[in-house]
Amino acid sequence: MQVTVNEHDAVERVATATPAGNREAHAHGTDKLAIEGGRRLAGEIAVSGAKNAALPILCAGLLSAEPVRLDNVPDLKDVRTTLALLGQMGMREETDGARVVLDASRVDNPVAPYELVKTMRASILVLGPLLARFGYAKVSLPGGCAIGARPVDQHIKGLQAMGAEIHIEHGYIEARAKRLSGARIVTDMITVTGTENLLMAATLADGETVIENAAREPEVTDLAHLLVAMGAKIDGIGTDRLVIQGVERLHGATHAVIPDRIEAGTFLCAVAAAGGDVTLTGMRAHILDAVIDKLREAGATIDEGVDTLRVRMDGRPSAVAIRTSEYPAFPTDMQAQFMALNAVAQGAAQVTETIFENRFMHVQELNRLGANIAVDGNTALVTGVPKLSGASVMATDLRASASLVIAGLCAQGETLVERIYHLDRGYDRMETKLTAVGANVRRISGSEA
């Protein structure tokens, strides 16, 4: 099976990971969501900035000594952890709502310690920028969600091709280079974080770097657009072949993070499963084509505006087969949500996961709610049932938790989703947004439970 490093995943924010600024600490590790199912959803939901674009973009702030101003930054646990990590290196940061201003002029500690990196795989994204600008980086090997092997060897191989001297010992990657040199890099697999790390490193390298088999995800493209705004020279943006002409230095820039296509897809899926009429605002439909096509196949009516998406659904959805693959195909980060949709659909459908092994941990929990799902290797057969029944379930990772929320919206009675710190890593106030469109969802804090 092909394993792709495809998502900037993290697990739990540690106590030290709340940065300066006015971003509040979110959920306690024992928070739960209580969902009373059976309500139609109607109204408007504003889509937040994309987590998987914001994390590399924050790390790109290391590449310049001038301020980088970012808008539409989501207020998420992973973002706060990244800001804490950057702050420990000497990065100064000012936050005002969804605007973050980064100043890396005084960065003097190019080390990413285990205490922070263990909570978030995306921490590896500091490796390329630190090495390119400072000639040295010491980064702990990452932790993250338990959804399969997501190796960092492609990052290391690419940086070595650019002349870096890299040693791994005592759980740390230690990298040195006087100045990186341009190189032709062919990754063994499509890796999103690998592409981003090598792209950032190449912007300050001496000469031309070509990245073949590059990831084409919109989040990679968004990072590239910021880098160009900072003075980088990049050709082939949005394709699988990136050509970068290194420059001596990058300057400051202003950039708005793209909308979160996975958050948008999750809400579209929720409406398609539970029924209703909801308009998503601040969303670009073209980055969600594969998901929209499948929702239409399931029976949803979706109208695309300039920056809006309206989804309407009456009656039960029809079962739809999905197969995950790299962008622009169906995203692995929407697989669990479609599993919940298929659980209440008419008919049966096969769900095939080609990106990660071990990404069916939500199946057992969905079956606790009355779903009929059988797993065979990397394929699940979902046979729809007329009704799910509320029960206590446990989130195992970020997207699995979203699938349990969708299932809870469709279930009779109360569903209690435990361990929602996973949800808070990737969704900005999900329960608040769902409540605003008529769902009966409330957070039970750890102190109440």
Swiss-Prot record:
<comment type="similarity">
    <text>Belongs to the EPSP synthase family. MurA subfamily.</text>
</comment>
<feature type="modified residue" description="2-(S-cysteinyl)pyruvic acid O-phosphothioketal">
    <location>
        <position position="145"/>
    </location>
</feature>
<feature type="compositionally biased region" description="Basic and acidic residues">
    <location>
        <begin position="1"/>
        <end position="12"/>
    </location>
</feature>
<keyword id="KW-0132">Cell division</keyword>
<keyword id="KW-0131">Cell cycle</keyword>
<keyword id="KW-0573">Peptidoglycan synthesis</keyword>
<keyword id="KW-0133">Cell shape</keyword>
<dbReference type="GO" id="GO:0009252">
    <property type="term" value="P:peptidoglycan biosynthetic process"/>
</dbReference>
<dbReference type="InterPro" id="IPR036968">
    <property type="entry name" value="Enolpyruvate_Tfrase_sf"/>
</dbReference>
<dbReference type="GO" id="GO:0008760">
    <property type="term" value="F:UDP-N-acetylglucosamine 1-carboxyvinyltransferase activity"/>
</dbReference>
<dbReference type="InterPro" id="IPR001986">
    <property type="entry name" value="Enolpyruvate_Tfrase_dom"/>
</dbReference>
<feature type="region of interest" description="Disordered">
    <location>
        <begin position="1"/>
        <end position="30"/>
    </location>
</feature>
<keyword id="KW-0963">Cytoplasm</keyword>
<feature type="binding site">
    <location>
        <position position="355"/>
    </location>
    <ligand>
        <name>UDP-N-acetyl-alpha-D-glucosamine</name>
    </ligand>
</feature>
<feature type="binding site">
    <location>
        <begin position="51"/>
        <end position="52"/>
    </location>
    <ligand>
        <name>phosphoenolpyruvate</name>
    </ligand>
</feature>
<dbReference type="GO" id="GO:0071555">
    <property type="term" value="P:cell wall organization"/>
</dbReference>
<protein>
    <recommendedName>
        <fullName>UDP-N-acetylglucosamine 1-carboxyvinyltransferase</fullName>
        <ecNumber>2.5.1.7</ecNumber>
    </recommendedName>
</protein>
<dbReference type="GO" id="GO:0051301">
    <property type="term" value="P:cell division"/>
</dbReference>
<feature type="binding site">
    <location>
        <position position="121"/>
    </location>
    <ligand>
        <name>UDP-N-acetyl-alpha-D-glucosamine</name>
    </ligand>
</feature>
<dbReference type="InterPro" id="IPR050068">
    <property type="entry name" value="MurA_subfamily"/>
</dbReference>
<feature type="binding site">
    <location>
        <begin position="150"/>
        <end position="154"/>
    </location>
    <ligand>
        <name>UDP-N-acetyl-alpha-D-glucosamine</name>
    </ligand>
</feature>
<dbReference type="GO" id="GO:0008360">
    <property type="term" value="P:regulation of cell shape"/>
</dbReference>
<feature type="active site" description="Proton donor">
    <location>
        <position position="145"/>
    </location>
</feature>
<comment type="function">
    <text>Cell wall formation. Adds enolpyruvyl to UDP-N-acetylglucosamine.</text>
</comment>
<dbReference type="GO" id="GO:0019277">
    <property type="term" value="P:UDP-N-acetylgalactosamine biosynthetic process"/>
</dbReference>
<keyword id="KW-0808">Transferase</keyword>
<dbReference type="GO" id="GO:0005737">
    <property type="term" value="C:cytoplasm"/>
</dbReference>
<dbReference type="Pfam" id="PF00275">
    <property type="entry name" value="EPSP_synthase"/>
</dbReference>
<dbReference type="InterPro" id="IPR013792">
    <property type="entry name" value="RNA3'P_cycl/enolpyr_Trfase_a/b"/>
</dbReference>
<comment type="pathway">
    <text>Cell wall biogenesis; peptidoglycan biosynthesis.</text>
</comment>
<dbReference type="InterPro" id="IPR005750">
    <property type="entry name" value="UDP_GlcNAc_COvinyl_MurA"/>
</dbReference>
<feature type="binding site">
    <location>
        <position position="333"/>
    </location>
    <ligand>
        <name>UDP-N-acetyl-alpha-D-glucosamine</name>
    </ligand>
</feature>
<keyword id="KW-0961">Cell wall biogenesis/degradation</keyword>
<keyword id="KW-0670">Pyruvate</keyword>
